[in-house]
Amino acid sequence: MKRIIFSLSLLLFIPGMYGQNGHITLEECQQKTQDNYPLVRQYDLVEKTKEYNLENAARGYLPQFALSAKASYQSDVTELPIAIPGVDIKGMAKDQYQVMLELQQQIWDGGGIRMQKKKATAEAEIDREKLNVDMYALNGRVNDLYFGILMLDEQLAQNALLQDELGRNFHQITAYVDNGIANQADLDAVKVEQLNTRQKRVELTSSRMAYLKMLSLLMGEVLSTETVLEKPVPQNELSAVSEIRRPELSWFDAQGAGLQVQEKALNVRHLPHFGLFVQGAYGNPGLNMLKNEFSPYYIAGVRYTLKNDRRVIENKRQQLDSNRDVFLFNTRLEMTQQDQSVRSLEKQMQDDDEIIRLRTNIRRAAEAKVANGTLTVTEMLRELTNESLARQAKAMHEIQRLMGIYQLKYTTNH
């Protein structure tokens, strides 16, 4: 007995091995997906890359050593064009060798190293904001699956009501057959509708299981078929003119800040950069080109550099501004469409209850006519189907409205 209790306790604490049998909300699904998605690990990689780049930039203050070796053979070498009597001047050898150690020390770079650090920080911020954009897109995928399951749940609920109603009609028509009011064909017509409804339930159940499996994969934990997805309750009302808070805007801002850093870096590069260098070498020839033998030598001096490419940054800034404007335009267009869709559904929902009431009255009247022998069972079943479709339409309108509200919420990031 103790062994059984221990085994059950162990199963309860194995991550990803238990079914979520209770209730779960949309926000919980979104958060679990964010935590489980493999892309989340790249946040640490971005931070580490930033640290490495900052360390590399800081090394610019340290002396830089470089060791090089060279061996070459020239097809021709420099020679004196004249002969001097009594003087034997040997020309340079065609095979030449050199080993050099160079030391460079930055004296003043006009703030170049400081700008490299700012650039590393700006690039890390751009990468981080891009990750935020990609991670935020997961919410849209979760929304589609979550509301897809809610729609299937409503259809399954209406399917169960229709099955109950058909079962009641089957017993009623059976009594009519016994009393000679209806015949076997009428009973078969009801049976066909029962079978069609049963097939539809199998299809809906299969679709729900597929959606649950996809949602489970995103979340990283198993959702059982008994899991109840709670209908979300919107906390605030949104419209087509609501403020846009999408992470893409922060990404655009980070890119703009990065271009500002690059522009400031260009200003730094316009300033003279000074550094000392010392080269010590051993080779043949040495600095004396006319001496054909291995010899050591050194060179010391001051180095100056200057560069310029400002137009590239201006083009990138214009492209970034264009991308931002296009994003805002498309987002506003999408918000307008979503807002109009929600308002249209709300207007339709105003008549749903009345349509159901009227369809119910028509179906009851049809049943009474069947009992009196003035209406066929097939015609009565048609009215029963119409009533069921009216109830399904109301349920779908409610879920579609919720989905539209949360699509608008996703589009604006509210």
Model-derived features: where do they sit?
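Bacterial Sec-dependent N-terminal signal peptides
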Residues: 1-27, 34, 413
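Periplasmic alpha-helical coiled-coil/stalk elements that build and connect Gram-negative outer-membrane
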Residues: 24-25, 52, 134-245, 387
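Amphipathic alpha-helical coiled-coil segments
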Residues: 42-57, 134, 138-157, 211, ...
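Transmembrane beta-barrel architecture of outer-membrane proteins
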Residues: 96-98, 144, 189, 273, ...
